[in-house]
Amino acid sequence: MKRSLGSNSSNNSGSGSNKKSKKNNNPSNQKTLGAAWGAASSRSSFRSSPFSDFGSYMEVKNRKLQNQFETEASAASRGVSGSEKLIFQGVSIFVDGFTIPSHQELKGYMMKYGGRFENYFSRRSVTHIICSNLPDSKVKNLRTFSRGLPVVKPTWIVDSISANRLLGWVPYQLDQLNDTQPKLSAFFAPRSHLTPQMASPVTSFQPDTGYSEAEEGSSIRADDSEEARDHIDDEIDGVYIENTTPELTEQTGTGDLKSSEMNAEGLGNYDIEEKEVSSELQSTTNLHSTSDNKSVHANGKNGGKSIATAAGSSTRRHSTLEDPNFVENYFKNSRLHFIGTWRNRYRKRFHGSSNGLKWADSGQNTAEMAKKSTIIHIDLDCFFVSVVIKNRLELHDKPVAVCHSDNPKGTAEISSANYPARAYGVKAGMFVRHAKDLCPQLVIVPYNFEAYEEVADQFYDILHRHCRKVQALSCDEAFLDVSDLSDVETEVLASTIRNEILETTGCSASAGIGGTMLMARLATRVAKPAGQLYISAEKVEEFLDQLPVGTLPGVGSVLKEKLVKQNIQTCGQLRLISKDSLQKDFGVKTGEMLWSYSRGLDLRSVTAVQESKSIGAEVNWGVRFRDQQDVFILVQHFLQCLCKEVSLRLQGCEMIGRTFTLKIKKRKKDAEEPTKYMGCGDCDNLSRSITVPAATDDIEVLQRISKKLFGSFCLDVKEVRGVGLQVSKLDSADPSNKGSRTLKSWLSSAPAVVQIEQDDNVFAAKVRENSDCNRPVTGGVSRLRESNSEESSIQSGDTNSSLPPMCYLDMEVLENLPPELLSELDGTYGGKLFELIEKKRGKRRINCNSPHVSLDGTAASIKELKSLSVKIHGLSTSGEKEYKEPYVPHPSIARTSNQHTIEMTDLLPSSLSQVDVSVLQELPEELRADVLGAFPSHRRQQSSSDVPKETCKKQDEEPIDLKGTENEIGLSFSSLWFGNPPLWTEKFKVSGNCTMEKLSAIYFKVAQSRPMLSLVLQHAISEMSSFPDAASASDLDKAIYDVCELLKQYINLKVGGDIEEIYLCFRLLKRLAARSQLFLQVYEILSPFIQASISEHYGGSLSIP
């Protein structure tokens, strides 16, 4: 009977009769969640099975799996002690999706420690759902998905095993409010998506930049004041810490906190700190990093493994991946950036308040001055905390710290802590989670940069009222040289200043007084908080005897360890070592420093704020790029924003620079993820520099240089973790002569610009009246300017006042000058030079195309001459981006000109292959565009002599937009790809060249709907078995030129957004070059051009195998 039910005939006969009844009975047969998949099946295979329906099959399967699990669990638990067997008793988990630990590992844990593992979800048997990430559909319907069960991360299992007890699942629940699933639109977003509107709003808690002070350049002083403070004061408030700069840390730390690129690569299964990310990222547009490699390595490598919860918002929105304003926000919310910008404001505000800030007497010995000097060191106590809580009396006696996040399990870093917090061991640079462990009642407050700025200004107003010699170290710390204030007691003055600061700002300050800057600062350390200490010269040795060597400026952890190995722990012990021994063991400079500081000697004097030796900016937090496609959009946008920031800093300091250094942090091979969220981690530091002839702060120059340097690294952008740009070899930028030192300004300068007079006859007559060379021209062109004030406007300068008389000029030299230079000289002489030349020639008439003017000075010739002068100088004088090229005669016309005619085309190369690309790249953009624009005109004139003169003039007069077409070449062929079909197809069709006609026909055949040149070239290879050469050399030259123009314009159209198309075209062109002499020459001519275009746009070269 069973065989007959399973036969084919039985299947066919019974399948149709029971279809409707089975559909009606489906819902009543469902017994598990998975039963719905197959309960409605009408296939006869289920009718022939021992199960009544799919639901019964699943019920039996689940029972079998549970039996297998219990058997394996019994065997696995034999080696486990009794106390460990029942950790997960009563817990039944269902694993959804990819997790770490894996599905099988979690199953093993349940077997070993008394839990149950469900292969199929059932609300009746499952107690916890384990997952790391959820798709968008489940996030939106979380209640439906979980059926009210807790959804927790797998770290709950791991941590419970580590603790040998069942931990509460609440801290580990997956509270994923937004999906992390990439959107399809993100992969096809145009360049226009990089708009400021995409930036997230900044709310109350602001991030800290924490970029390296050494890299800051313009913001942070280059001397050792920060380093000294770092090692002198163990209770420092985090303002100048080099090794623990705030907010992001750790280039060597590891952990399992996932960074954004891991999610982007589909590895987002690590246990990212959800509440930390939600707290730190939702409250700000971005976070910031330090650039030091050692700041939190001591915090442990696995500190983040027990942290659970997932990001409340997409982490990529707070990195370079999707935040177009990332760089701007990075520095906007930076504490160190605030200090740097404040220093610039201070320099401008108090400039000249202390006699130009130059106090040292150059005729007096520095050592002699140090002996009789008295220095006060003033430092506000816990500045960044005190300013925030000064109006919050309830927090004055409580432990408080400044940070961007108060998440107790976060990796945000403490920037500054008050003294009650420091009593618990809380220090600057410490993770919030570690600080909360030491001090659970720690109160976290956000930054208030406006209040900081106000208090800092009040602080320095008070200092400058009481002392003339003030050296600002930061917004809250300064040295005062009161050696010349003999009418007031030093200690009384310090006390008066401190009391006035407290009354005005509401913040306490500490003061140290000593004979040197070193002793004053050491005294402040002892006086803190809210006190003052005076160390007289007689008490210096006594004070230093028991002072640990680690508190001396410049003694870091490495140097301190070396000293301890030699049993040198105090300054008293250090004084027993001779200078020669110290210099032998630690080097000349370090040995000199140790010997001097151990005796309280310090030859430094209080001076003004020193000019920065370098200015730059570095970003090494949140830098993540997906793949090579980001090079063309996100990387370039990032570099543009970074160059904008550096340019603004240069302009703020009124400096320009010549050497540009691009620094890259590249993730080390096999480096683990950093403990700090979105940190740079363990990196290799790479850098390359370039020096330009003329100093500049122009943002376009910086962008071009940075793109070129970045391309020279040849990096996988996925490995980039930090980028910095530094400008050195600085020079002062005089605002009144800004731009006068640039090559562009020198080339475009015109001492005289002649305005076209409506009545040219009157102008010509007046020029003839003033062209007499019998009387010397004294006093420059002043009289010329007076006589021609109505007809011409002449820009005078120092050069004009020393011009030689025209009668002293060598006419033979003048006649052989280039037309542009000759026109410029003519303008300098008020338009009289051309007439003088003609008079010397005996009043000979010359062709109107010549750059000279006839003696009788007809209106037409003068008008053309003046038009030429305006065209030559129009770019520099009008300030417009569009200009007209001067008319250059056609070669055929030039041959008929007078022998004195000077053609500009004589100065141009015969082909672009003769141009040095490296030199071309170093030219300013306007000059480079001018050179590239002139070259095709020259080629066109040589190869198309049959073009009418009127056509040439019309084409030459068409303006070129330098801004819109940065690499635009050709003056009259810019429309070959205009229209549908493009104009070149008609031109090629009637060219008379077989190859060109065939290309036109192929376009209409295959590419009319998709105007892609690669389609035309691809079909040309397959359809054209042979390529007949032109009948004559001139025809071949003309065809080569026309095809070159077609490809050049196509490159200009595509190079900015479709480099793949250009690559494909030149691969195909190289194949065509093997078959045709025409395409071979085209390929050789265009190869340097394409490489120059690629280098200009992307900073590299295009490899064409």
UniProtKB/Swiss-Prot annotation:
Localization terms from the record: Nucleus
UniProt motif (Nuclear localization signal) ranges: 953-961
The protein's Enzyme Commission number: 2.7.7.-
Listed PROSITE patterns: BRCT, UMUC
Cofactor names: Mn(2+); Mg(2+)
Positions annotated to bind dCTP: R335, D379, L380, D381, C382, F383, S416, A417, N418, Y419, P420, A421, R422, D476
Primary enzyme class: transferase
Residues annotated as the enzyme's active site: E477
Chain positions of site Interaction with target DNA: K676
Consequences of knocking out this gene: Reduced UV light- and gamma ray-induced mutation frequency. Slightly sensitive to ultraviolet-B (UV-B) and DNA cross-linkers (e.g. mitomycin C MMC and cisplatin). Lower germination rate.
SUBUNIT field: Monomer.
Name this polypeptide is given: DNA repair protein REV1
Native species: Arabidopsis thaliana (Mouse-ear cress)
Lineage: Eukaryota, Viridiplantae, Streptophyta, Embryophyta, Tracheophyta
Gene name for this UniProt entry: REV1
